[in-house]
Amino acid sequence: MTVHTAAEKAYILSEALPYIQRFYDKTIVIKYGGNAMTERHLMEAFAKDVVLLKLVGMNPVVVHGGGPQIAGLLQRIGKQSEFIQGMRVTDEETLDVVEMVLGGLVNQDIVTLINKHGGRAVGLTGKDGNFIHAKKMLVKSKEKADEMLDIGQVGEITGIDPEIIQVLDARDFIPVVAPLGTDAEGNAYNINADVAAGKIAGVLQAEKVIFMTNTPGVLDKDKKLLTGLTPREISDLIADDTISGGMIPKVGYAVDAVNSGVKTAHIIDGRVEHALLLEVLTPEGVGTLIKRS
């Protein structure tokens, strides 16, 4: 390593100092998904990022999805995946697969990677400690305005008890949450990971909630990244079709989070190696930051 290269690295580290100081002992909820969960080098980079955030005094909470892995296992057992309005129809057999993949395979893979890089991760689902309360979600029919569709064991969050997360944080563990919930009768529900991350961040009054996606962030009509937005600006961008398609629910979850007391929400590109550190510890960031004003 040359002196010049060493000096560049030292400068980068010193640039992170004000952010380390600002976010010390703050909670950062990270929705982990997309390519960052399926490409091994990105998975390793993500685990290192989470461990580093913890080591410099922040409290990361990871909430993960697992759609591709669920689809892969369903295909292997010969079961067709069915979606209604973007949501997976979850019958009993599908729920068994969802619980196996989210609560077992994917969750433990993330835990193992974080621990491999020096963290102390603990895997759990929303059923553990009964901390994610849910009820059956019904979806409005597009054909009949007054008809509600039953899509199986897909859940709508009715409440979150944050105690188990707070206990783990206080003991310097890193919670890794699979988005499964339960009702008073013990019925299990598959829950959208973006929704779960936003709700958990709101209940914890987190400093940040970060949604890792397969896009750079929110783009304008010229496909240029919009680095900062408010809820009102987002409404205007939806109205003029700048924000459309799958980005609409994503920004909706981000707006819900900041309206519930989360300081800032971020939509970042999980395909960028070390995107998490770049968003939290640099002045430029790598995605779109959303805050109330």
From Swiss-Prot:
It catalyses: N-acetyl-L-glutamate + ATP = N-acetyl-L-glutamyl 5-phosphate + ADP. InterPro entries: AceGlu_kinase-like_sf, AcgluKinase_fam, ArgB, Asp/Glu/Uridylate_kinase, NAGK-C. The keyword Cytoplasm applies. Keywords: Amino-acid biosynthesis, Arginine biosynthesis, ATP-binding, Cytoplasm, Kinase, Nucleotide-binding, Transferase. SUPFAM superfamilies: Carbamate kinase-like. The record marks 31, 250 as: Transition state stabilizer. It is an enzyme of class 2 (transferase). Its main location: cytoplasm. Pathway: Amino-acid biosynthesis; L-arginine biosynthesis; N(2)-acetyl-L-ornithine from L-glutamate: step 2/4. PANTHER family: N-ACETYLGLUTAMATE SYNTHASE, N-ACETYLGLUTAMATE SYNTHASE, MITOCHONDRIAL. This is Acetylglutamate kinase. It comes from Thiobacillus denitrificans (strain ATCC 25259 / T1).
